[in-house]
Amino acid sequence: MSDLYTIDPMLAKDAHIDRAHYKTLYHESIEQPEAFWNKVSQRLEWFKAPTKIKNVSYQLEDVHIRWFEDGELNASVNCLDRHLTLRGDKTALLFEPDAPDAPSSRITYRELYERVCQLGNALRHLGIEKGDRVTIYLPMIPDAVVAILACARIGAIHSVVFGGFAANSIADRVNDCGSKLIITADEGLRGGRKIPLKANVDAALKIHGTQSVETVLVVRHTGSTINMHTPRDRWFHDLVDIQATECAPERMNAEDSLFILYTSGSTGKPKGVLHTTGGYLVYTSYTHETVFDLRENDIYWCTADIGWITGHSYIVYGPLANGTTVLLFEGTPHYPTVSRFWEVIDKHHVTLFYTAPTAIRALMREGDTPVKKTSRKSLRLLGSVGEPINPEAWHWYYTIVGNGRCPIVDTWWQTETGGILITPLIGATDLKPGSVTLPFFGIRPALVDTNGQTLDGPAAGNLVLLDSWPGQMRTLYGDHQRFIDTYFRTYPNTYFTGDGCRRDADGYYWITGRVDDVINISGHRIGTAEIESTLVAHPKVAEAAVVGFPHPIKGQGIYAYVTLITGETPSEALHQELLTWVRKEIGAIAIPDHVQWASNLPKTRSGKIMRRILRKIAENAPDQLGDTSTLADPSIVDLLLNERLKH
């Protein structure tokens, strides 16, 4: 297997940005950031063009981040109105339902505009004003996009809660931001199962602290019988269908709040990441066009849920601001068969495909046949997002899914960053499997040691960012001090990402996992991601998760949870084979002290492995597991506890 995939000259010739252009623009973006971002901001339509481009301080006594602060615009106008003249009849949303035999549907930019205006008018009729918070708890259906853009149109701040979260999670988020209104559906559909969304909202609103909610709008999706509580609950369609199809957009200052999105897995009080209007929209639209080398006739599919930042930035705001045709998929990669993703790609002639390593590894586990039953000839670019992709999965994605002809953009970014920060550009960057490669324009990454000393050249350390970019979060909602303490206090005058990272001799960046996913063995620091990648590279291993546990001699030991590919069974011989494999690939220091076979791993509904829970199982501390309600399948925890090895 090659560890370097050089730029395809034909791709570079047609790409938006080639290598020379990247170097020129990157230099300009670092040396003259205000001039650079002023020019980029002109891609949007402003009521009042900004003249004050950047006003940022990372000083602990005065952390503030403001971009385009005297500009005025509206996000929904940029995603809808400005496309009506030339793209009014172009498909904005291609909706593919959960069930493959259910009809898919198309919504044009004009139809989406009219529906957003109708909901905007309905929200105003219900007393929602600029600055009010609206919670959106919907499945992956077109009305979720409508709800987001309708809030943006009237200046309401949306807080989307992932449709897999239960009542307590909804209540926490409603309570924290003081929502006046919730938009939900009778039920969701996912993998052939019904999700009781309205019932979850009802349960949430019985929890103390949710009394700010005055109205619940309910989309009739499955048609099942549900409880409606009058006068609080209203049917969405009854109210929205009668509204006018024109709705005057609110003039928003660039620094007016656009949305709050709560980070998953945080302990205690939820962390409400706040993004504002101008900088976020400039950054998401620019990164979407540039990273995906966007063309007018592309069919773009990001498989994330709208409840996560990837859905906000790269299903809704970035793509629609660019006038893209976006595929919206309600289902799962495994329903009704493991060929579903590839069948949907063929059905809708998808050209750009953006998914998570978790999905790639899960489908790789099923073998090549389900993929090869389909053609996927429409694809021209593949993307990866959400966590580091191990080289083995990268190669499979490239060779099998992309037929060895589609470059992969392995993108690194966070809820807090708003958009992609480190990524290849297909016409400018040679690819290394497992590396997120080089920084995007305006991004100044650096590596520091635990004392905050900058590490030059090839090195491994903590990833920090030395300067701001327009898409950066502005604060944590209602808790600016926590924002400062979380992101700026650890290494003063920098933004601390919380991620460990390695930089190689070519200046390429390799994300090694969260800093708390580093194991210190006898004074040697080793990233769990490196051990995991090595285990997954073994031909019989589908997935692996590695955590540290207290060791009486070494300080920390290595505990590995291993899921085998379909058809393989655990054995002592295979156990020894894996230990030998790790010794050969990394060295004796990385050999796991314990290997536990796991039929599945505990994951959040967004697909992230909950290593916090795996650590507690490894430590034999079941009473310290904490909240497991965000897991897709909490029963896995009991299974792992029961099978836990004694040590």
UniProtKB/Swiss-Prot annotation:
Its EC number is 6.2.1.1. It is an enzyme of class 6 (ligase). One of its GO terms (cellular component) is cytosol. Mg(2+) binds at V536, H538, V541. Its cofactor is Mg(2+). CoA binds at R190, G191, G192, R193, T310, S522, R583. One of its GO terms (molecular function) is acetate-CoA ligase activity. GO terms for biological process: acetyl-CoA biosynthetic process from acetate. The modification N6-acetyllysine is found at K608. The keyword Nucleotide-binding applies. It catalyses: acetate + ATP + CoA = acetyl-CoA + AMP + diphosphate. SUPFAM superfamilies: Acetyl-CoA synthetase-like. It comes from the Bacteria. ATP binds at G386, E387, P388, D410, T411, W412, W413, Q414, T415, D499, R514, R525. Acetylated. Deacetylation by the SIR2-homolog deacetylase activates the enzyme. Keywords: Acetylation, ATP-binding, Ligase, Magnesium, Metal-binding, Nucleotide-binding. It holds the Pfam family AMP-binding. Catalyzes the conversion of acetate into acetyl-CoA (AcCoA), an essential intermediate at the junction of anabolic and catabolic pathways. AcsA undergoes a two-step reaction. In the first half reaction, AcsA combines acetate with ATP to form acetyl-adenylate (AcAMP) intermediate. In the second half reaction, it can then transfer the acetyl group from AcAMP to the sulfhydryl group of CoA, forming the product AcCoA. Belongs to the ATP-dependent AMP-binding enzyme family. HAMAP family: Ac_CoA_synth. This is Acetyl-coenzyme A synthetase. It comes from Xylella fastidiosa (strain Temecula1 / ATCC 700964).
